[in-house]
């Protein structure tokens, strides 16, 4: 389940989720501000840039791909190289403060604000576990296990690993 932000202007039509963009449910404009430089944010930015969009990633941390579970070193190097190759601008140590009609207002760690123009703002600031289905089925199915993103938002490797562990130990 995606983490939602509560900021001024976040309800505007130009604000989209990375999941909606990747699933094809929503289309972006030509210039895109990607809020969140984690793995899904960077992969979404790359997807958009390969489609001809002008993309800027804004990340609150010191570097992109530094939140959450570490990714394999060679994958990280390749992804960073691809972001550069496709001309994706990266702005670190900044956060989204507000969505405006023309784009957004960012704020850095020294509380300096800057306005940026963007047709679309794509939000990808993380995920949290979703136990809705598990809770609905708990007590109704004898052998029900909480794994994958229902247990903890992570990546496909963790989901497969936990399923394998349960399969081997049942």
Predicted regions and their residues:
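A Rossmann-like FAD-binding core segment of flavoenzymes
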Residues: 1-5, 9-30, 50-136, 140
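Short beta-strand/turn micro-motifs composed of small residues
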Residues: 36, 59-61, 148
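Glycine-rich Rossmann-fold phosphate-binding loop(s) that bind the pyrophosphate
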Residues: 36-38, 126
């Amino acid at each position: 389940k995606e983490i939602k932000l509560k900021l001024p202007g976040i309800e505007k039509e130009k604000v989209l989720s990375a999941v909606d963009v990747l699933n094809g449910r929503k289309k972006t404009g030509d210039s895109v501000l990607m809020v969140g430089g984690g793995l899904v944010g960077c992969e979404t930015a790359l997807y958009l840039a390969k489609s001809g969009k002008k993309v800027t990633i804004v990340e609150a941390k010191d570097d992109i791909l530094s939140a959450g579970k570490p990714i394999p070193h060679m994958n990280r190097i390749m992804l960073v190289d691809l972001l550069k190759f496709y001309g994706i601008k990266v702005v670190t140590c900044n956060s989204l403060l507000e969505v405006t009609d023309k784009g957004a207002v960012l704020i850095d760690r020294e509380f300096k604000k800057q306005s940026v123009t963007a047709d679309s703002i794509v939000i990808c600031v993380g995920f949290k576990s979703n136990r809705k289905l598990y809770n609905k089925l708990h007590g109704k199915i004898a052998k029900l296990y909480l794994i994958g993103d229902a247990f903890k938002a992570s990546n496909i490797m963790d989901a497969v690993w936990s399923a394998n562990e349960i399969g081997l130990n049942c």
